[in-house]
């Protein structure tokens, strides 16, 4: 009679042991310490506090020692995305409300990450142009409230600058890494491609946010750095030196550009009453209580409404900004995302999240169609429809008159690649994961020739060296 009971007990013991073993082996920190001798997984949380909304990027990484020698020591297996609106800058008068706005995102992260992994999951929040444009005290008050919420989230946030305002140039660098990692232009698991990154295989990244726009690429001809001093970022990527050309143009984001263009068309006396007039909207149309940078505006259409008039003002604004001519990229496909993609999607230039290839002239053609619409046609309830003429005209002028691409310039519009968002989030996730590994002990990889070395140098981490602002990997150090 004791044998059946003993059998049940033995089966239960081995079932429990199997669960514990699976938990330990599946997660890199399954038993509370780092286990990296087998394929394992871990999470990193990045919160993008943009000018128009706050976005959760929850990345599930997989580390596979068997393929580490073919490229990345770990890579993103899955991304979970969620967005809340408005952006943090909208809570300038109530910083605590800014912190409260994060709660749906934190709750989603807590739901997706197993509880025993919370303290082993690094979290970071980076604010962008929306907070950069606020007066210093307001931005600081919001960040202080948000930082407290992040630090009490249950996730790991005990490293420097876990919550801060990200420099625009960092957005560009991280976006470039995300794009090229997803496209596998830097490293790939295919041995026939080769593991040495090369400029000619990489692609240029153009990001259009609400307050700023960024461009980043790896030039084949380094003479461009002499022509545009201060736009260089030197990095060491997996032991390979890369000189990136990158810059962020504050005030040239889509929403900021709207206000700048409208102000060019409006007399100062009228503007002082918070009224703006634009030829980018039809006569008789009024958009009331439009908010930007803590101010409200009433916008009125004009009798001179046309693509030609709208383009004339937009071109003046673009040419007065610091956007530069990029000769090397002429004729080569460049990747555009964020608002570039959104407005192309609204106009039917691309279908769905997969994006597609177009030529620059198609933005002009879409703008001409949008600028012919009458008052009744643009008042359909879509938040973007009244702005479509101006937005498309600005995008065309930015690329044509700013970067001076020809109308036949090939453009690749992207929102997701391999089911993951094209943004700076994934690039930052690698850096954040590295900071955490420095704290916990780095994942080992066959990439190093030293048997006792780690991959501290294999996972990029933003480290600024002197005035050159060098983005580098840590050199290999012994355990």
From Swiss-Prot:
GO terms for biological process: GDP metabolic process; UDP metabolic process. Residues 25-479 are lumenal. Its cofactor is Ca(2+); Mg(2+); Mn(2+). Gene3D superfamilies: 3.30.420.40, Exopolyphosphatase. Domain 2. Its main location: membrane. It is found in: Endomembrane system. Induction: By stress such as high temperature or ethanol. The keyword Glycoprotein applies. It catalyses: a ribonucleoside 5'-diphosphate + H2O = a ribonucleoside 5'-phosphate + phosphate + H(+). Its EC number is 3.6.1.6. It is a single-pass type II membrane protein. The active site is at residue 171. GO terms for molecular function: GDP phosphatase activity; metal ion binding; UDP phosphatase activity. The chain crosses the membrane at residues 8-24. Glycans are attached at residues 300, 452. Optimum pH is 8.0 for UDP and 7.5 for GDP. Keywords: Calcium, Glycoprotein, Hydrolase, Magnesium, Membrane, Metal-binding, Signal-anchor, Stress response, Transmembrane, Transmembrane helix. Belongs to the GDA1/CD39 NTPase family. This is Nucleoside-diphosphatase uda-1. It comes from Caenorhabditis elegans. The gene is uda-1.
């Amino acid at each position: 009679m004791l044998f059946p009971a003993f059998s049940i007990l033995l089966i239960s013991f081995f079932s429990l042991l199997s669960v514990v073993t699976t938990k330990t082996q599946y997660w890199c920190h399954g038993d509370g310490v780092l286990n990296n001798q087998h394929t394992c997984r871990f999470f990193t949380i990045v919160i993008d506090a943009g000018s128009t909304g706050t976005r959760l990027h929850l990345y599930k990484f997989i580390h596979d020692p068997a393929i580490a020698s073919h490229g990345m020591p770990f890579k993103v297996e899955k991304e979970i995305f969620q967005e809340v609106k408005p952006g943090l800058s909208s809570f300038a008068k109530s910083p605590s409300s800014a912190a409260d706005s994060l709660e749906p995102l934190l709750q989603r992260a807590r739901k997706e990450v197993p509880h025993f992994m919370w303290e082993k999951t690094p979290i970071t929040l980076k604010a962008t142009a929306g907070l950069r444009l606020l007066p210093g005290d307001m931005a600081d008050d919001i960040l202080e409230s948000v930082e407290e919420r992040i630090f009490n989230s249950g996730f790991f946030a005990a490293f420097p600058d876990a919550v801060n305002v990200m420099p625009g140039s960092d957005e560009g660098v991280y976006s470039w890494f995300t794009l090229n990692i997803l496209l596998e232009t830097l490293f790939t698991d295919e041995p026939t491609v080769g593991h040495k990154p090369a400029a000619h295989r990489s692609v240029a990244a153009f990001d259009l946010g609400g307050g700023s726009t960024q461009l980043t690429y790896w030039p084949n001809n380094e003479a461009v750095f002499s022509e545009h001093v201060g736009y260089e970022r030197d990095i060491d990527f997996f032991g390979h030196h890369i000189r990136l050309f990158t810059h962020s143009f504050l005030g040239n984001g889509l929403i900021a550009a709207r206000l700048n263009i409208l102000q060019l068309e409006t007399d100062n006396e009228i503007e002082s009453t918070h009224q703006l007039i634009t030829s980018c909207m039809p006569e008789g149309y009024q958009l009331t209580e439009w908010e930007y940078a803590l101010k409200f505006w009433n916008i009125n259409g004009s009798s001179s409404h046309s693509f030609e008039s709208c383009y004339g003002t937009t071109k003046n604004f673009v040419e007065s900004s610091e956007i530069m001519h990029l000769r090397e990229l002429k004729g080569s496909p460049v990747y555009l995302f964020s608002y570039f993609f959104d407005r192309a999607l609204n106009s039917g230039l691309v279908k769905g999240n997969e994006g597609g290839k177009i030529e620059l002239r198609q933005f002009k053609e879409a703008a001409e169609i949008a600028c012919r619409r009458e008052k009744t046609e643009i008042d359909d309830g879509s938040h973007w429809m009244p702005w479509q003429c101006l937005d498309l005209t600005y995008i065309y002028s930015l690329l044509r008159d700013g970067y001076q691409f020809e109308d036949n310039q090939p453009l690749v519009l992207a929102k997701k690649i391999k089911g993951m968002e094209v943004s700076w989030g994934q690039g930052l996730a690698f850096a954040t994961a590295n900071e955490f590994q420095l704290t916990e002990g780095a994942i080992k990889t066959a990439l190093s020739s030293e048997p006792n070395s780690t991959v501290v140098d294999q996972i990029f981490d933003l480290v600024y060296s002197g005035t050159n602002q060098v983005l580098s990997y840590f050199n290999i150090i012994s355990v």
